[in-house]
Curated annotation (Swiss-Prot):
The lineage of its organism: Bacteria, Pseudomonadati, Pseudomonadota, Alphaproteobacteria, Hyphomicrobiales. Keywords: Ribonucleoprotein, Ribosomal protein, RNA-binding, rRNA-binding, tRNA-binding. Transmembrane segments: none annotated. GO terms for biological process: translation. PANTHER family: RIBOSOMAL PROTEIN S7. It comes from Methylobacterium radiotolerans (strain ATCC 27329 / DSM 1819 / JCM 2831 / NBRC 15690 / NCIMB 10815 / 0-1). Belongs to the universal ribosomal protein uS7 family. InterPro entries: Ribosomal_uS7 (IPR000235), Ribosomal_uS7_bac/org-type (IPR005717), Ribosomal_uS7_CS (IPR020606), Ribosomal_uS7_dom (IPR023798), Ribosomal_uS7_dom_sf (IPR036823). The keyword Nucleus does not apply. One of the primary rRNA binding proteins, it binds directly to 16S rRNA where it nucleates assembly of the head domain of the 30S subunit. Is located at the subunit interface close to the decoding center, probably blocks exit of the E-site tRNA. It holds the Pfam family Ribosomal_S7. This is Small ribosomal subunit protein uS7. The keyword RNA-binding applies. GO terms for molecular function: rRNA binding; structural constituent of ribosome; tRNA binding.
Length: 156
């Protein structure tokens, strides 16, 4: 265990429109160079498009997308006697959420639509329906863990 102090968890203020803490984390991850108002405009714009297309509550679509993208298990490298094994381990809740947010944003940024608002809304709808690059990333992670199940006894 480290002798240094671990970083204190900061309290995150819920977003003003929907009152959701996870949505604030999502906005903070989208934000570039401290431009929070731009990040808010992107997210709220995407939510408006989701509401029009899906005829559903955008927060519920967002939560469904996060649940469908969040990995249950991942592989971690572990050195044993000169060989490096990919050992499957369960993902902690906080890391699951962080990975889901990161993968959703990466997938949205890699899409070919015109604006980030359109890309994000399309990726959220795809992820909520178990499609899209973010869900594919989770499936790849699970596949890697399944392929390396033989090394699960090296878990720490």
């Amino acid at each position: 265990m480290s002798r240094r102090h671990s970083a204190e968890k900061r309290e995150i203020i819920p977003d003003p429109k929907y009152g959701d803490v996870v949505l604030t984390k999502f906005m903070n991850s989208i934000m570039y160079e401290g431009k929070k108002s731009t990040a808010e405009r992107i997210v709220y714009g995407a939510f408006d498009i989701v509401e029009n297309r899906a005829r559903a509550n955008p927060i519920e679509v967002f939560r469904a997308a996060l649940d469908n993208v969040a990995p249950m298990i991942e592989v971690r490298s572990r050195r044993v006697g000169g060989a490096t094994y990919q050992v499957p381990v369960e993902v902690r809740t906080e890391r699951r959420q962080a990975l889901a947010i990161r993968w959703l944003i990466q997938a949205a940024r890699s899409r070919n639509d015109r604006t980030m608002v359109e890309r994000l809304s399309a990726e959220l709808l795809d992820a909520a329906n178990n499609r899209g690059n973010a869900v594919k990333k989770r499936e790849d992670t699970h596949r890697m863990a399944e392929a390396n199940r033989a090394f699960s006894h090296y878990r720490w």
